Amino acid sequence: MFAVTVEFTLDLAQRHAFMPLMLENAARSREDEPGCRQFDVCTDATRPDRVFLYELYDDAAAFDAHLAAPHFRAFAAATATMVVGRVLERWERVAP
């Protein structure tokens, strides 16, 4: 399995606009992408400007397909000005 973590730092004034778009992107990823096995969206009340994602895919090609999916491209375009920072890391899962 191929794991991806993403930590977004948001423009705090845009958080309420960002979250519904993020949740829709996560749902569409799980429902529409056969290679997406898990897509968790996490927040921390002590850091309201942060959103953390944990995603599992069958392999790197499935993640590449996610990045090319129309729903992801629409999400990325719609949220571009809401995000002030993003750290994406790719991992190989070795145990559940």
Cite the ranges covered by each PLM segment:
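Generic structural signal for secondary-structure transition and capping sites
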Residues: 27, 34, 62, 72, ...
